C-alpha cells in the first residue's frame, strides 16, 4: 500500500541545494523487518524522518549538498548528516558545505570523486555567533527556495506542480511561452550564482583566511561566477544577443533549450520531422518528452 512507502534520499545526479528526492521505499512491517536483517541493517534508523542535509558521495559534477526535509529515510547512496547541537543553524552548515572553502577542504582530505562520512568528520568547522549564522544561512535558504521554484516544473520531482508550458500559458503562442520560461529560468539561476558568491565571501571572512589562503582556494576551485566583474557594456551586449537568439532563433533551437532545462539532455525520445507545427501539437510533444524524464 502507498502509505507503507516512505520518501527515500538516494543521491543521484549533481544537484546542489535541493532535489533528488524522487524515490520511495517499502517500509511496511514485513519489509522493515527484512531490512533489519539484510544489507546494512539500517544502522542509522534513529535519524530517519529528521531534518538534515543529504549529499551525493560521488558524481561527475563533484560533491553536492542539499537540504533534506523532514519525513525522509536515506541510505549510503544519499548519505545524510544531522545537527546534534541546538546552537548550530542548519542553513549555515549547508552554506559552508556548498562553499568553495568547504569543497577545497573536502578535496584536500579525499582527492577522489567519492567523499566518505569519515572525511566530513575531519573537516574543520568555525561556528560564528547566531546573527552571523542567520546572515549566511539566509542565502542558503534562498537558494533552496529558488532551486525548488525550478524543480516544481519537473514531473519526476515530488514537489511537481505544473509543466512550464501550462504555467506560463496566458493565451500566448507556445514559442512566447518558452521565451518567458527560459528568461525566468536564467534569471533564477543568476540569483543562485550570486548568492553562492556572497556565501563564499562571507565564509572566507568567518574563517579569517589570508589573501594567500584565498588565492590557494580560488586557484583550485575556481572563482565563483557571481564574483566576476561585468561592465555595463558587456552586460548590455549579452542581454541584446540573448534576446536576439530567443526572438530570432528557429523553432527547433528554442525547443531544444527548453528540453535541455527540463529533461537535462538534448537527446530526445522521439524524432520531430515538422517543426512548423501547431501550438497544440507542440505542447503535446513537450508533455510526452518531459514525462519520459
For the regions a protein language model found, what residue spans apply to each?
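Noncatalytic linker/hinge segments flanking ATPase motor cores
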Residues: 50, 97, 120-123, 163-168
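Residues that form generic nucleotide/phosphate-binding pockets
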Residues: 8, 96, 104, 108, ...
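Basic, amphipathic alpha-helical recognition segments used for DNA target recognition
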Residues: 46, 56-122, 129-146
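Non-catalytic, well-ordered alpha-helical scaffold segments
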Residues: 3, 52, 90-95, 201
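Polyanion-binding catalytic cores of nucleic-acid enzymes and NTP/SAM-utilizing transferases
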Residues: 1-83, 141, 149, 185, ...
Amino acid at each position: 500500500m502507498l502509505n507503507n512507502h516512505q520518501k527515500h534520499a538516494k543521491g543521484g545526479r549533481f544537484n546542489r541545494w535541493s532535489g533528488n528526492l524522487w524515490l520511495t521505499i517499502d517500509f511496511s512491517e514485513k519489509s522493515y523487518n527484512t531490512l533489519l536483517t539484510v544489507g546494512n541493517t539500517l544502522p542509522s534508523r534513529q535519524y530517519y524522518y529528521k531534518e538534515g542535509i543529504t549529499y551525493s558521495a560521488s558524481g561527475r559534477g563533484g560533491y553536492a549538498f542539499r537540504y533534506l526535509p523532514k519525513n525522509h529515510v536515506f541510505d549510503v547512496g544519499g548519505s545524510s548528516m544531522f545537527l546534534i547541537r541546538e546552537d548550530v543553524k542548519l542553513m549555515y552548515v549547508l552554506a559552508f558545505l556548498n562553499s568553495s572553502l568547504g569543497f577545497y577542504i573536502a578535496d584536500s582530505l579525499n582527492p577522489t570523486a567519492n567523499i566518505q562520512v569519515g572525511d566530513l568528520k575531519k573537516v574543520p568547522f568555525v561556528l560564528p555567533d547566531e546573527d552571523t549564522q542567520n546572515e549566511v544561512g539566509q542565502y542558503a535558504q534562498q537558494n533552496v527556495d529558488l532551486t525548488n521554484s525550478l524543480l516544481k516544473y519537473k514531473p519526476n520531482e515530488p514537489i511537481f506542480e505544473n509543466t512550464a508550458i501550462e504555467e506560463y500559458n496566458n493565451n500566448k503562442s507556445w514559442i512566447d511561452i518558452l521565451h518567458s520560461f527560459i528568461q525566468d529560468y536564467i534569471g533564477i539561476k543568476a540569483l543562485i550564482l550570486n548568492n553562492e558568491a556572497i556565501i563564499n565571501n562571507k565564509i572566507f571572512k568567518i574563517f579569517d583566511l589570508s589573501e594567500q589562503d584565498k588565492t590557494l582556494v580560488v586557484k583550485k576551485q575556481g572563482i565563483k561566477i557571481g564574483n566576476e566583474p561585468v561592465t555595463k557594456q558587456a552586460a548590455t551586449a549579452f542581454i541584446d544577443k540573448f534576446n536576439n537568439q530567443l526572438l530570432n532563433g528557429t523553432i527547433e533551437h528554442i525547443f531544444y533549450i527548453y528540453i535541455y532545462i527540463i529533461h537535462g539532455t538534448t537527446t530526445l525520445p522521439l524524432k520531430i520531422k515538422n517543426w512548423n507545427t501547431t501550438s497544440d501539437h507542440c505542447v503535446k510533444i513537450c508533455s510526452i518528452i518531459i514525462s519520459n524524464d
